[in-house]
Regions:
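N-terminal Rossmann-like FAD-binding beta1-loop-alpha1 element of flavoenzymes
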Residues: 4-31
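C-terminal lid/capping helical subdomain adjacent to the catalytic/cofactor pocket in oxidative enzymes
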Residues: 21, 25, 323-371
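Active-site substrate-recognition segment that forms the wall
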Residues: 21, 50, 82-85, 180, ...
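Glycine-rich FAD pyrophosphate-binding loop
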Residues: 24-45
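Dinucleotide-binding Rossmann-like beta1-alpha1 core, especially the glycine-rich loop
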Residues: 48-124, 134, 254
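Glycine-rich phosphate/pyrophosphate-binding beta-alpha loops
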Residues: 55, 143-145, 249-252, 339-353
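Short beta-strand to alpha-helix junction loop
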Residues: 57-68, 92-101, 138-157, 167, ...
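Helical element adjacent to the flavin cofactor pocket in flavoenzyme catalytic cores
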Residues: 138-198
């Protein structure tokens, strides 16, 4: 049985960030990725937004990691030359009954330490975004966009320069706690059984499945809930210069406008609860999406939109259930030395990745190395 020092399961942005943090701390790190390349799931199927920290309950892990991670991510991108823009975002109340919700998010943001939001007068937001129809709006100057692929490439480069290794096409099939860490059974073309003092489960959509396979007590394995979202791209030139977000809906942040680094506008994501990982783009999504967009952008009626992408959010609560916080469960929770499980890392996971990596790896920083 091959013996390793530290194993990270999952090479999405959070897994790569965690592996990088461990490697920079002097650990010998191996990343196991089930897919042929890094970031094939949520890390590359999202809006690529750097969130300010507006929506999340004060004191929650989402709030703390988002605000800290935002600043860390902006610094990291600037230092590494990763394409990003602090483009800003308008939060809009399309109707009068949404104004209290908008003001609630203003209060929430301030409680989270986001102190740069500004309530706009009508003439101000009309000057910023003439196509937007609303009754109230708030500007978030610290919201931005980032090239998530370039970010993952940079994190992987840091990991490899620090001596870490990425092994793709290597799904985790099973395992168990041992006296000095964990056994991990790895599939693929050349199945192998390994022993590692430290295992960090960043498997994203499959994190509950992997946790159970490694022997995590069932009481500490949340259910896997999948919320698929669909994005449509706006054909032709974008009328927007920044992101535009309506008031959130159940399961997501509403059908919002995002811009990529080339300036193309996309609308989405919507929410469709599914029971398995499936990236099919079903027909019939456009009409409902157009209705949602028209509430704050009436000009959508005269514009063509085309299917762009779909992604799946990893959730631990299903439809009709209260939204859940990020979960980072270490030995103090589940009782298995050397194991850290990350669950429900949906939005703002991209923004929070560097902060989550520090929090997760701190739980096993003192784990002994393999002799």
């Amino acid at each position: 049985m091959e013996r390793l020092d530290a194993v990270v399961i999952g090479a999405g942005v959070v897994g790569l960030a965690a592996a990088r943090a461990l490697a920079l701390a002097g650990r010998e790190v191996t990343v196991l990725e089930a897919e042929p390349r890094v970031g094939m799931h949520a890390s590359s199927r999202n809006s690529e937004v750097i969130h300010a920290g507006i929506y999340y309950a004060p004191g929650s892990l989402k709030a703390r990691a988002c605000v800290a991670g935002r600043d860390m991510l902006y610094r990291y991108c600037a230092e590494r030359g990763i394409a990003h823009r602090r483009i800003g975002k308008l939060l809009v109340a399309a109707h009068a009954d949404e104004v209290p919700v908008l003001m609630h998010y203003l209060d929430t943001a301030r409680a989270n330490g986001v102190d740069d939001l500004r309530v706009l007068q009508r003439e101000e937001w009309r000057e910023l975004e003439p196509e937007v129809e609303a009754v109230a709006a708030i500007l978030s100057p610290s919201t931005g966009i980032v090239d998530s692929h370039a970010l993952m490439t940079s994190l992987l480069g840091d990991l490899q320069r620090a001596g870490g290794t990425l092994v793709c096409n290597s799904p985790v099939l099973g395992g168990a706690p041992t006296g000095g860490g964990l056994r991990v059974d790895v599939g693929g073309a050349d199945p192998v059984r390994i022993a590692s003092r430290t295992v960090v489960n960043c498997a994203g959509l499959r994190a509950p499945q992997v946790a159970a396979a490694l022997g995590t007590p069932q009481a500490w394995v949340p259910p896997a809930r999948f919320a698929r979202g669909h994005w449509f791209a706006l054909s032709g030139a974008s009328p927007f210069r920044r992101l535009v977000y309506p008031m959130p809906e159940t399961g997501g942040l509403g059908i919002h406008v995002t811009l990529d680094l080339a300036g193309q506008a996309r609308f989405g994501p919507d929410v469709e609860w599914i029971d398995r990982i499936d990236y099919g783009f079903p027909a019939g999504r456009e009409a409902a999406l157009r209705r949602a967009i028209a509430r704050y952008y009436p000009g959508i009626a005269a514009r063509e939109i085309v299917p762009a992408q779909c992604g799946i959010r990893a959730k631990t609560a299903g439809p009709g259930e209260p939204a859940q916080d990020f979960r980072i469960d270490g030995p103090a929770q589940h009782g298995i030395p050397g194991l850290v499980n990350l669950f429900g890392i949906e939005s703002p996971g991209l923004t929070a990745a560097l902060a989550l990596a520090e929090i997760a790896t701190a739980q096993i920083a003192d784990s002994p190395r393999t002799p």
